[in-house]
Amino acid sequence: MALSTSSPLPLYQTPEIDGNTILLKVPWYPSAELEWCWAASAQMLACFFQGSLTDQCKFANLLFSGQDCCASPSACNQPIDLNEVTKLFESFDKSATFLSNPIEFEDIQTEISAGRPVQVGYQWSDQSNHVAVIAGVSQDNVGSLVYVNDPDPQFGNGWVYYSNLRLAYGDGTWQWTWTVNP
């Protein structure tokens, strides 16, 4: 899933909040390879759920059988089919529901409140795809915020308004969602 070359995320590191903030301890990791947003997102989620670090290349090995992505990561530096993302969840003993649409802020709140991060998929304006992880929710006097762990180092992690996330930070649209099954 290609990374965008758009401007940095309009992050709000210290939002004025109303006490309804929930932030899960999902670690942030950058993509080890340009096309590995999916592997970095899986790494974040696996570390959150299992408490141990799995190399991104091992997630690539799961999907590119016959290749040693740890010895030669550039050979595996490619996007994956969206249907393969659920296999990554299974690798850390979770199942996920794939939705071909964004979910409402209230639904994200429900997931985060239950201790389940949400994975989102964007389609950039150039038609390439990208995934990231929502790890928190909050509200300020302007609107609803989500805490995004975006594996693209130019975006990183931080607070962004939900309305801006729906527009893939102004450079596309949020098209897909993966929720972790209880």
Q: What is the meaning of each model-derived region?
A:
Residues 9-67:
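Active-site nucleophile-adjacent alpha helix/oxyanion-hole segment immediately C-terminal to the catalytic cysteine
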